[in-house]
Amino acid sequence: MRTERDKMLAGELYDALDPALVRDRDRARDLCQILNATRESDRELRRQIYLQLFGKGGETVWMQPPFFCDYGSNIELGERVFFNFNCVVLDVCPVKIGDYTLFGPAVQILTPMHPLEAGLRRKQEYAKPIEIGSDVWVGGGALILPGVRIGSKAVIGAGSVVTRDVPDGVFAAGNPCRVIREITETDHADVK
């Protein structure tokens, strides 16, 4: 028989109050609470928490707490991912983040969805996975919504609401987020 966790990860309707899922969320939130109470000099303690919290990739992640997530185990991080202050990852479905991706302060990555029909919404929810490529920069306050894929080397403007896929190598911004232009070699000329 399929568990509520199996249904959740498959993007199907599931019961978020299932006791096993509640225990998993409690575990992640307890770890986040410990992490968020650390001092800047507690680097080794933070590293140990990352290894316990994340499904994959806690070895090289860098972050400025506070940080919040639902499960942690559904977050897969590439090399040297950076989260600035107040980031939230609601990882009901898998969240995959590529190497060297940077998140500004208060970015929210949100996989959960709720049925529009009120009766279903009382007891069930569902989610869609999110994938973010390598070398992406997500500006502060951006919201990344369920089912979105952001391509490698993309830049998402601060405060954007990403409701659909963003291709590789573009600057995208707005609410809803849309492609503004491609990132070109001339963009490197501004950096001295």
Task: Say what each PLM segment does.
Residues 1-60, 177-192:
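Terminal amphipathic alpha-helical/low-complexity segments used for targeting or macromolecular assembly
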Residues 34-36, 164-169:
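Short arginine-rich
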Residues 62, 137, 155, 171-173:
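Short-chain dehydrogenase/reductase
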Residues 67-77, 82-149, 175-192:
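Flexible, glycine/small-residue-enriched loop-and-beta-strand segment within the central core
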Residues 102, 154-155:
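Short alpha-helix at the nucleotide-sugar/activated-sugar donor binding site of glycosyltransferases
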Residues 148-151, 166:
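Extended beta-solenoid/beta-helix repeat architectures
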Residues 159-160, 165-167, 177, 183-184:
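Short glycine-rich donor-binding/catalytic loop of glycosyltransferases
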